[in-house]
Amino acid sequence: VSGYRRDVYIPEEWKGKRLLLTIDGAAHESEVYWNGKKIGEHHCGYTAFTMDISDDAVYGIRNTLVVKVDSRESVNIPPFGFVIDYMTYGGLYREVWLDIKEKTYLKDVFVRGDLSGDTGRLISEITADGSGENLSVRQKIRRCGESGYRLLGECEMTGTKLVLDYTVESVLSWDTVHPVCYEVCTQLIRDEKVLDENVTVTGFRHAEFKADGFYLNGKKVKLRGLNRHQSYPYVGYAMPESMQRMDADILKYELGVNAVRTSHYPQSHYFIDQCD
């Protein structure tokens, strides 16, 4: 069992906002305290969790965050059950951050792209938190590295969930040799004011398995891959963004693989982003 403590200054100007505390990875059972009050717990060491501390924060002074992490095996917490064949290192091993949002904000944006020829299809599942009238969602897109966005459209949002489906002309495809990626900017708007903004990186590709193998964008591709665990010698799981990205580069450029299985749990989003 280990403990982590950090003092956090909360300025007065954050009053009336949403303060969202996210812990990206705490192995394996954790309890979170804010100014001595328990505000949450989590029972998995591989998934992120978020707590709203808006009502618990004291503004204009330093607040105290404490995280208690229990790294012992338990049959009630994945991946335990006395059958796993890998080490499950403990502790607070990924980042912790605080997002400052408006009362109504984008809670989740899930984007996926498909491809037919040079025409892309972009499907977005959008979840908002909060309430109010006159809400709309605007989406725009650009190729990564370009300066200007092109508008996809704007749609009224009457509830907390919205699905958008756009056709995007003249796109470049994503594949393992030329991994062209696009930034999708999603904005939550009320009366022409942008309340929140989310930028998601995606690509346009069509993947399918047929009887004779795997096809990417209509071309047969032989998958050469391996399993990847997130542990490192001497340090366990606790490695920064630079090492996560370098590991993906090693797999591609030194080992020559074009596929990786993230065994057996959600891994660092930095590693996943570098694979993209």
Explain the meaning of each model-derived region:
Residues 36, 96, 182, 218, ...:
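Conserved, mostly hydrophobic/aromatic
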